[in-house]
């Protein structure tokens, strides 16, 4: 669905993808490899008989004035799962909102602010052995947001300079390890699972670029 009028735009889209034989890490070991002290199970990628990814996408563009424009889009996940086990297919935000405010200050100067808001992120329900996750393997990433600012100057009709800062408030997200616990029961050496904390969110970053057009 979409509506347009006098520079305004609003829309919403429903999407659904039903999969057969989607590739996913298998749960059943197909063999083992051993050293003098360690025995490790071997797993392989397998086909998921049925899986589904479903959600909503929305957009809203607002012409605040002749020189200011506000654009927004959001994705909300309704489901993303293995239909055989009910487990999540991957670690993705419940929703992602992107908002951009652009101001054409002068014919050759523009300013822009960007805002991204990520929803809750949940890990898989089952580990690589097909058992329910426990302890730190169940850790979720809480919602958080990132703000960016930039300015562009058109030096000539062919050359422009852009400078700005990403992650203005220096929001940090640290990777704590692999999603699930691995280790050896005989030696007691374990690397405990990190749940959804499997990626880094870089801190504040300053940048500058030169762009050319022909």
Tell what function each PLM region has.
Residues 11-19, 27-30, 35-126, 213:
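Gram-negative outer-membrane beta-barrel transporters
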Residues 1-3, 58-62, 99-103, 113, ...:
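Residues on the lipid-exposed face of transmembrane beta-strands in outer-membrane beta-barrel proteins
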Residues 41-46, 82-88, 133-138, 148, ...:
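Extracellular loop and loop/strand-boundary signature of outer-membrane beta-barrel proteins
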Residues 117-129, 152-214:
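C-terminal beta-signal and adjacent terminal beta-strands/loops
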Residues 4-6, 52-54, 91-97, 143-147, ...:
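Residues that define the transmembrane beta-barrel architecture of outer-membrane proteins
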Residues 24-44, 133, 181-193:
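Surface-exposed loop/turn segments flanking beta-strands in extracellular/periplasmic regions
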Residues 6-7, 20, 66, 107, ...:
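Short coil turns and loop connectors of transmembrane beta-barrels in diderm outer membranes
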